[in-house]
Amino acid sequence: LPAFRPAAEVAAFGWLRKEAAGGEVVLAAYQTSNALPAWTPVRVVAGHGPETPGLAELTPRVEGFFDVLTTAEARLALLKAEQVDYLFYGPAERTLGGWDPTSWECLRPAYASGAYAIYSTCMGSDA
């Protein structure tokens, strides 16, 4: 990971730090998830290697979530299994398959700025 984070990404992390309750779960690409808990009180599905039980099994599921060919049912199954409250969507997530989260009914826009968006999920505590 780079020694710095893009300003727009840091701003998105800041939004989560203010809005997410401690312990809420965020789904994001590994690259994002590895940094996110250092900036916010959230948990991530697959992040810092030694602190993610089952990382080898979770990584392909997380990557597949963002693949355009993945079904809505498979996405929903991951959200349920991991009790995901928020989806983080930025450049790292876009590289995983080109899926566009804006049209999925299980997501509600919560934050958007530049190349970064955060969605609350239909699994979230306020759903």
Write out the residue ranges for each language-model feature.
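Extracytoplasmic
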Residues: 1-127
